[in-house]
Structures are given as structure tokens and as C-alpha cells.
Curated annotation (Swiss-Prot):
SUPFAM superfamilies: EPT/RTPC-like (SSF55205)
Described purpose of this protein according to its UniProt entry: Catalyzes the transfer of the enolpyruvyl moiety of phosphoenolpyruvate (PEP) to the 5-hydroxyl of shikimate-3-phosphate (S3P) to produce enolpyruvyl shikimate-3-phosphate and inorganic phosphate.
Pathway: Metabolic intermediate biosynthesis; chorismate biosynthesis
Classification via HAMAP family: EPSP_synth
The protein, known as: 3-phosphoshikimate 1-carboxyvinyltransferase
Gene expressing this chain: aroA
Keyword entries, A-Z: Amino-acid biosynthesis, Aromatic amino acid biosynthesis, Cytoplasm, Transferase
NCBIfam families: aroA (TIGR01356)
Length: 399
């Protein structure tokens, strides 16, 4: 795809539905007593993988309606490239008698599963393997577990869902991306799950109620369009609730640190450009924002440092991917173990790679809009993982 620089970006969009909430709603609907309706679900490669997964466990899915089985049954789950699908399915398989096989695409086979596997083994499940493909044979025999969550909060969220299935005490050690755990808890509350907590220790009681659940808008995908407003003009994104707990709401604070003007409405966010200055940021709690924050840093005056602990374990090695692409655009970049040091300026047009990573594709598309010449973004099809309509929305802002 060729993207040519523009003079400004001004416009208004509706945020797509949240991928994270959509995943959680479908898995809870699988466990529920009674039918559930998922309103406004995100339809993308990852959430389709989750729908296929809950079907393999015995749920009936007809559009937005989920009819749970009397008891989830073991089966085969192919998670495509969805880490959430793989980890939640692995955890829930621990509550089922019989063997479940979980597998995924090549990159997903490389992503960490060890913390979750060790936790399930500690609960008495039989697990063959520490990365995909693996088999899980339940049911678990113990009601208390401590999990190392330093590589992924999804280990914790998966065990919380298992708790809603069988009852469980969960202690999360060194959790990263903590807001995603809060999103899991909020969705559990919507499905009538009862739990107690003290910090990141939880006691979850079994029982999920079928419900009508409306998926909120997605701050993660909206961040790319809002960044375009900060860099090139003014953008408003609707369907973003101020009273939410999504991880990437912290992206707005980061934009303000850079010097952008941010207005948070009850159900919208508006961002307008300002004089952008370098910052030092740790986005370990909202790592999905790292690629687009690196792009903002490439245009900000001065030397920025953007870090997050788990960046090398995503759909791509995002530290390396952004270092390679920004360097091709003439940006001075130094690669750190857990992030990037970026000297801001005016990137030039270049041929860049997406590394088959949806967030790299989106970030580099925004970077290209302000470059000194046209850019070629290779393999943009990866955006279908989280927002198939990304480029349609971007074109609306440029009309």
C-alpha cells in the first residue's frame, strides 16, 4: 500500500468495538447458565478464533447469541494468531474432564505459555507441553494457585475465568498489563460472577449468569486515529466511555505528556496537535500503545525513551520491528532491551514492513502521513487481526 503525506488530518470517527471485551464476553457466555446476547461484538480474525474455540467446547453461536452447553466438553482449539484465545482456552480446559488440544499459527507457537502451564499443573491438571501445541486434561483438583504473570496478564485473566467455572483462589505475582485484569473482572461482574480481592489476590466463586452484554468501544484501535490528531491536526473519536478501565486509556495521558491537547467527553475523546516535546514513558501496563507512541516520539522535538517489559513477546518483536521501520524513515533510533530511544524530527518516506503485526501496520500508516515523501507499507492485510476496517476509517479522516 502506498501512503502519501498530507497537509493535515481533521475529522470524526466511531471507535470499533473492543477486542479485549469481546473475547471475555464470549468466553463467559460459554460458561454461563442460560443464553447470552453479545451486542456490538468486534468481528475480526482474533474474535472469530474465540468464537470457534467456544464452539469446540460445545457452545452454540448464532450471530450475537450464545447458547452454552450443559457442560463444556473437551475438543480441539485452533487459536489462529490470537494469544487471548489460546491462553483463555488453555485455562478453561483445566476445568474439563478429558483431553483438549490447543494449537495456533507459527508466531503464536513462539509466545510464552509457561506461567499458565505451571499454574494449571499446580492445580492438578495434566498438561503436555510448555508452548503450543499442548494438551490439557482436567479437571483441576485444587482450589488455590499462584501464577507468575510477569510475561502476560492473560495468564491471570484465564485463571479468573477458570475460577468462574470451578471456583478458585488466584494470586498474581509480578503482573504486567494490570488494566487488562481489571477488564476481566469488570466483564465477570456483568455476567454475575462473584469474587473477592485484596490487591492482586482473588477468590472467585463458581457461577456465571447468561446476560445481554454490550461491548464498549476500543481505546486500543482508537489510539492510532487520536495520534493522527496529535501529529497532524484534530481528531474526535466517539464511542469511547470515560468511565472505563481499558489499558490504552493511559495513551491519552501519554499524548498530554508529549504536549498534545486532549479532551475527554462522557462518550468521546478529542485530540488536537500542539508543540510536541520528547518524553520518557514506561507503557508496561498498556503495551499495545508502544508502536504508535514510538511514532509520536519520532515527530516530537528531542530524545524520547519509550519502554515496556513484554514487547518482544507480542505478534512480533515490537521493539525490533519499530527500530527497523523508523530507521528506514531516517529516524535516529537506539534499540534497548525493553524499548527504544528515539530522536525526534521529520521522518522521510520509505518502504517499511509490518512483520505480520496489525499494530505495526497501523502505526507505520500513521507515521507515513507526515513524512517528507510517499511510503510503501508492505502486507497491510494484518490489520484484519483486530480492525478489518482500519484503512476505511483512515480514509474518512483524510477526505
Amino acid at each position: 500500500m502506498i501512503i502519501r503525506p498530507v497537509d493535515e488530518v481533521r475529522g470524526e470517527l466511531n471507535a470499533p468495538p473492543s477486542k479485549s471485551y469481546t473475547h471475555r464476553a464470549y468466553f463467559l457466555a460459554l460458561l454461563a447458565e442460560g443464553e447470552s446476547t453479545i451486542e456490538n461484538p468486534l468481528v475480526c480474525d482474533d474474535t472469530l478464533a474465540t468464537i470457534e474455540a467456544i464452539r469446540s467446547f460445545g457452545a452454540g453461536v448464532d450471530g450475537k447469541t450464545v447458547v452454552p452447553p450443559e457442560e463444556p466438553s473437551p475438543g480441539f482449539v485452533y487459536a489462529r494468531e490470537s494469544g487471548t484465545t489460546a491462553r483463555f482456552s488453555t485455562a478453561l480446559a483445566g476445568g474439563i474432564g478429558g483431553k483438549t488440544l490447543i494449537d495456533g499459527a507459527r508466531r503464536l507457537r513462539e509466545r510464552p505459555m509457561d506461567g499458565l502451564v505451571k499454574a494449571l499443573k499446580g492445580l492438578g491438571a495434566e498438561v503436555d507441553g510448555f508452548s503450543l501445541p499442548l494438551t490439557v486434561k482436567g479437571p483441576v483438583k485444587s482450589g488455590r494457585v499462584s501464577v507468575d504473570a510477569s510475561k502476560s496478564s492473560q495468564f491471570v485473566s484465564g485463571l479468573l475465568l477458570l475460577g468462574a467455572e470451578v471456583g478458585l483462589k488466584v494470586e498474581a505475582r509480578n503482573p504486567v498489563s494490570k488494566p487488562y485484569i481489571e477488564m476481566t473482572l469488570r466483564t465477570m461482574e456483568a455476567f454475575g460472577v462473584e469474587f473477592e480481592r485484596e490487591g492482586f489476590s482473588f477468590e472467585v466463586y463458581p457461577g456465571v449468569k447468561g446476560t445481554r452484554y454490550k461491548v464498549p468501544g476500543d481505546y486500543s484501535t482508537a489510539s492510532f486515529f487520536l495520534a493522527a490528531g496529535a501529529l497532524y491536526g484534530k481528531v474526535r473519536v466517539n464511542n469511547l466511555l470515560r468511565e472505563d478501565v481499558q489499558a490504552d486509556m493511559a495513551f491519552l495521558d501519554a499524548l498530554e505528556e508529549f504536549g498534545a491537547r486532549v479532551k475527554r467527553g462522557r462518550d468521546y475523546v478529542k485530540v488536537e496537535g500542539g508543540e510536541l516535546k520528547a518524553v520518557a514513558l514506561d507503557c508496561s501496563d498498556f503495551p499495545d500503545s508502544f508502536p504508535i507512541l514510538a511514532v509520536v516520539a519520532a515527530y516530537a522535538e528531542g530524545r524520547s525513551v519509550i519502554r515496556a517489559r513484554q514487547l518482544r513477546f507480542k505478534e512480533s518483536d515490537r521493539v525490533r520491528a519499530m527500530a527497523v521501520n523508523l530507521s528506514r524513515m531516517g529516524v535516529k533510533v537506539r534499540e534497548l532491551e525493553d524499548g527504544l530511544e528515539i530522536e525526534g524530527g521529520r521522518p522521510r518516506g520509505a518502504k517499511v514492513e509490518t512483520f505480520n503485526d496489525h499494530r505495526i501496520a497501523m502505526a507505520m500508516s500513521i507515521a507515513a502521513l507526515g513524512a517528507t515523501g510517499p511510503s510503501i507499507i508492505e502486507d497491510t492485510e494484518s490489520v484484519s487481526k483486530s480492525h478489518p476496517g482500519f484503512f476505511d476509517d483512515l480514509r474518512r479522516l483524510l477526505e
